[in-house]
Amino acid sequence: HIITSAGVVLASYYRYRHRPAALASFLAGWLIDVDHVVDYVSAHGWKLNWARFSEAKHEHYSGKLYLPLHSFELLALFFLFFKGPRRQPYRVGITLSILTHLILDQRCNPSRKPLTYFLAHRIRKRFDAAQILGVPIGEPALEST
């Protein structure tokens, strides 16, 4: 996500010449992943296990898929409410960074169904990973490193 965010930053800076907005776009494009902490804690508690955290399959342990920031609805709300000419560089750059993040996640995670990145869908399914992903969820084996 850092690479795609960097691409958006370059385009944003080229268009607006606004360094703070370019930096915000870069950070938004990959810091959205902090919401994986919610899923990790739900699955494993507060004790950090790097192998489990980095495998990013927390829904297999908890049976839940939260990812509260990975949401097309939140992106649309941001785009609709963050208006004004002074905010335009932020609005466009951040929106594009998050949108590319969500699209990349959708494409690189084939188990994720088209509605997975809609928060309303996850809420309607009560965050039940098996229903959201449409596959049985079981505890995966950790690979030894």
Region locations from a protein language model:
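N-terminal membrane-targeting hydrophobic helices
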Residues: 1-145
